[in-house]
From Swiss-Prot:
GO terms for molecular function: structural constituent of ribosome. Pfam families: Ribosomal_L29 (PF00831). GO terms for biological process: translation. It comes from Hamiltonella defensa subsp. Acyrthosiphon pisum (strain 5AT). Keywords: Ribonucleoprotein, Ribosomal protein. The gene is rpmC. This is Large ribosomal subunit protein uL29. SUPFAM superfamilies: Ribosomal protein L29 (L29p).
Amino acid sequence: MELKELRKKSIEELEREILKLLREQFNLRMHAAASQLKETDLFKKIRRDIARIKTLLTEKVRVS
C-alpha cells in the first residue's frame, strides 16, 4: 500500500486497515505452520504496512 493512499484516509479507516492486515498476518502464520505457504515474502510486506499505518496514526493523533 502506498503512503499517498494512506495519508488520505481517516483515523477510523486506518484502524480498520490495521485490523485487516493483522488478520491477514495471522492467516499467513497459520498457513506457514501447516507448510502451505509459498510466498514467504508476504510476512515482510504486511509487517511493514502495519508499521507504516501505525506511524501515520501517531502523526495524525499528535496533529489533532
